[in-house]
Regions:
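Short amphipathic alpha helix immediately N-terminal
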Residues: 96-112
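Helix-turn-helix DNA-binding module
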Residues: 110-126
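N-terminal interaction/assembly modules
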Residues: 1-93, 116, 137, 141-152
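Short coil/turn residues that cap or connect secondary-structure elements
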Residues: 92, 96-99, 127
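Alpha-helix N-cap/helix-initiation sites
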Residues: 81, 101, 125-129
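Short, well-structured alpha-helical interface segments that form or flank functional binding sites
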Residues: 13, 112, 130
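DNA-recognition helix of helix-turn-helix
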Residues: 122-142
Length: 152
């Protein structure tokens, strides 16, 4: 029983890669906005405190370089998302049951909420959860027989 639970958890992690990568992209986008905001601030803090001996004279340049680096990471992450979705689609469509395929597709490839998954599949949320659980079991079996695909 425990091995089955571990297999199902590994299958869920495998299927959830695009969603995790998308959250990482959103975090990086927020960081870029914050960095650009810091870089373009023109107000100087007026204080009677002494200045440091070595002020960062390239503050704006440093912030913009960090933002550009994050933008490059986002492009690489988007490629990783697309690759993961292609792998997941191929694995999902290898499952025999059409309803399980549809639930897994809408949940993990389209990254839809449960209510949207149920609506797209024309069933109640509880029924979508049942198809999901069976689909994840079948995915775990496939992954255990073929060797677990590399998580990136």
């Amino acid at each position: 029983m425990e091995a089955n639970t571990v297999g199902k958890e590994a299958a869920r992690e495998y299927l959830d890669r695009p969603r995790r990568l998308q959250h990482g992209i959103e975090n990086k986008k927020h960081k870029i906005v914050a960095l650009r905001d810091l870089a373009t601030r023109t107000t100087a803090a007026i204080s009677d405190m002494p200045r440091s001996d070595s002020p960062n004279l390239q503050r704006m340049e440093t912030m913009l370089c960090k933002a550009a680096d994050l933008e490059r990471e986002i492009v690489a992450d988007q490629v990783a998302i697309d690759t993961a979705k292609e792998e997941i689609m191929a694995a999902v469509f290898d499952i025999e049951d059409y309803r399980e395929q549809q639930v897994l597709y809408h949940r993990y490839v389209e990254c839809q909420a449960w209510s949207a998954v149920a609506e797209a599949c024309g069933c109640h949320i509880r029924t979508a959860h049942r198809f999901h659980d069976r689909g994840v079991e079948h995915m775990a079996e496939k992954l255990s027989h073929s060797g677990h695909p590399k998580n990136t």
